[in-house]
Amino acid sequence: MASRRKSTTPCMVLASEQDPDLELISDLDEGPPILTPVENAKAESVSSDEEVHGSVDSDNQQNKKVEGGYECKYCTFQTPDLNMFTFHVDSEHPNVVLNSSYVCVECNFLTKRYDALSEHNLKYHPGEENFKLTMVKRNNQTIFEQTINDLTFDGSFVKEENTEQGESIDVSSSGISISKTPIMKMMKNKVENKRITVHHNSAEGTSEEKENGVKASQEENAESVSSSALESNTSTSTINRVHPSPASTVVTPTAVLPGLAQVITAVSAQQNSNLLPKVLIPVNSIPTYNAALDNNPLLLNTYNKFPYPTMSEITVLSAQAKYTEEQIKIWFSAQRLKHGVSWTPEEVEEARRKQFNGTVHTVPQTITVIPTHISTGSNGLPSILQTCQIVGQPGLVLTQVAGTNTLPVTAPIALTVAGVPNQTNVQKSQVPAAQPATDTKPATAAVPSSPSVRPEAALVNPDSFGIRAKKTKEQLAELKVSYLKNQFPHDSEIIRLMKITGLTKGEIKKWFSDTRYNQRNSKSNQCLHLNNDSSATIIIDSSDETPEPPAAAASQQKQSWNPFPDFAPQKFKEKTAEQLRALQASFLNSSVLTDEEVNRLRAQTKLTRREIDAWFTEKNKTKALKDEKIEVDESNVGSSKEEPGESSPGDETVAPKSGGTGKICKKTPEQLHMLKSAFVRTQWPSAEEYDKLAEESGLARTDIVSWFGDTRYAWKNGNLKWYYYYQSSNSSSLNGLSSLRRRGRGRPKGRGRGRPRGRPRGGKRMNTWDRVPSLIKFKTGTAILKDYYLKHKFLNEQDLDELVNRSHMGYEQVREWFAERQRRSELGIELFEENEEEDEVVDDQEEDEEETDDSDTWEPPRHVKRKLSKSDD
């Protein structure tokens, strides 16, 4: 205990002498809990290098003291050991303290023994020496509350002026600051727990108190409190009580978050971070806190943008700043505690969504201008803002707060609202002296007077309230060079620009999109000649790098240009079919958007300007006009066969230049065979495969693309029966069969279509049933079943799947066919129809004649349809 700071003030007081008015304020009272100063006796921490001042007792007698030790007030006992002193009081003066307890306010740790409290301090507060013990009495129980001295993160003491109303006193009492109360106990409800309070100096205070407040911020005061009953010793660093002042302006998050474009968020700039209300928690009470991160510009910039980073952002920051993720997380948590930022998860998501979507909501805005003598007279703090460029929406009201000794503002402040044409003047009014400061709008910000406002010295960080920062000259130069090469950058180019410029992928894509948009709508293509003037006004828009047009041009485009466009997310999947049809029709007419076309589409589709522009940009980038076609009615597709020479609407759209008649030439059997074989290999050929097919088949590439699209549609609807045949057959057998058919076409004219006389019925076809199926078997399907039945005489369930695949019939159809054969066998009638073999041969002949049909979907011949309809009947 030798290293612990000690006080000569005894820790114990007789219970009978305890003033009942000195009890702790009930937690049920309204407002923040404020501990009444204990004026009786207390043990306070005193620095080892500071002198210990003796206190005057009720008889005004000076007591002897032991340097760094304890002495008993009621006898001559003196000891440097607190444990021995406690034992002495318990044994010699048993009525002094009854039922004592020790509480660590920082950790809510409660114990009956001081030894346990010491062990707790060694374990959870290692190296901490700034403890202060305060004795309070509650319900006949003496409680010693241990708190830590009010050191802020930068190691300085915070003093707040005592503006107590009523009976004036010359000296202020020492107590526990409200900021030392645990955060969860500071406010009583959810809304108050997140309030941000900006304290102004009370205009009702005397000038004498103001002068004392200025001096108190520059030096340390040692104040002693006289008491008629007991003596007390104060520490050299006095922590004054905090009283609610009517001059404080309370800003709730509901007023701050929607108005992210207000000037109040400028207070969160890093240059003025030490001026904000701080939660007074020592740095060494936070585990693994690294103070070196306080000077890291990357972390400071990220915190100014958004105080709640995501895990991915923390990972990136860890890689860039060369610190661990845990250190960065703790640093962000400490900064939020330091600046009093406490948002719920819902508010964090809402603020993040508004920031990255770029929405700026209209909120009544009031800027309070405080004269310099008022803003610095109460607490000695420097001006909150030196110079500021106000970036926001119209309707700003500039007011001046008047105190008891009102002085005129030295010079009017000129405020420029960016993005609003002809917005040059801002109203200014004078507030009467009797009007309290609480009558101002909920969203207020303190702005000191300054001779002029320089736009180039803007301390407002636009990213801190959802507005993107203006790009630097180097970033714009890289973007312009890339834009001149390609207006639609690829992913590799975007990644390269991200590495060079440090911008995000969304910012780069948005810059390209807005540059294309501005180039289309600019008469003289001035979008590339960017204005590099440092004093240019920040435009709250994605086109912040484009110059403002001349006054005449600005007046002409005032109706069509919105300074606050809607930044709706580009969700293409949410567009309805009617919206897509309208966009497609407009794109087919012209791929270049005009203002009239955009306005028409906005009225027709109810889409935003950004969504329409993004959709057209994506269409131009992918060059997908040739691949996308207007689908025909599903009831007609697949149910009726296209006549020879008839083309689909998609074919007319894709290949309108073939003869000018909208018809495409017939495909030869070899071309169809080549396309079908390629379709079996892949339904989605690559660009190289399309080129190869066009070269080998001699067809136009657009015809091949159109054929694949129609074939995919037919395959999806189950109207592509030749697919299984090509899938199970090899190319050599197909080539052989096609060559045999071509030789068969050269038969004599007098020869009929019947079977050769010397050819036995079904001779070769019954040798083996598992040979490569011919087109005849594929067309009817029953020939495969017949060969299987002649070989096995019954249906084996293990072969059912193979029979279904080879015959292209359903499972029930195959079973019914074999059941019919079994029924015929039991009745003793003919197992097979007499004309079945002839139909097969005739089918071969019909196939020879219809092979040149370039229909994309296959259908059985008419005579097979008639036979199938009879079997169904």
From Swiss-Prot:
Modified residues (Phosphothreonine): 36
DNA-binding region: 284-346, 464-526, 569-630, 660-722, 777-832
Induction: By interleukin-2.
Principal localisation: nucleus
Region annotated Disordered, chain positions: 41-63, 198-247, 429-456, 541-568, 627-668, 731-767, 829-873
Biased amino acid composition, Basic and acidic residues: 50-63
CDD domains referenced in this protein's UniProt entry, alphabetically: homeodomain
Key word Ubl conjugation present: yes
Pfam families: Homeodomain, Homez, zf_C2H2_ZHX
Cross-link Glycyl lysine isopeptide (Lys-Gly) (interchain with G-Cter in SUMO2) mapped to chain: 159, 441, 485, 629
Region: Required for repressor activity, residue numbers: 831-873
Region (Required for interaction with NFYA): 272-564
Residues recorded as bearing Phosphoserine in the entry: 45, 47-48, 202, 648, 774
Signal sequence extent: none
Compartments (UniProt record): Nucleus
Comp. bias regions, Low complexity: 223-238
Residue ranges with Basic residues bias: 740-764, 863-873
Entry annotated with the keyword Hydrolase: no
Ranges annotated as biased composition (Acidic residues): 831-857
Subunit structure and binding partners: Forms homodimers. Heterodimer (via HD1 domain) with ZHX2 (via HD1 domain). Also forms a heterodimer with ZHX3 which is a prerequisite for repressor activity. Interacts with ATF7IP and NFYA. Interacts (via homeobox domains) with DNMT3B (via PWWP domain).
Reported function: Acts as a transcriptional repressor. Increases DNMT3B-mediated repressive transcriptional activity when DNMT3B is tethered to DNA. May link molecule between DNMT3B and other co-repressor proteins.
Family, as annotated: Belongs to the ZHX family.
Full protein name: Zinc fingers and homeoboxes protein 1
Classification of source organism: Eukaryota, Metazoa, Chordata, Craniata, Vertebrata
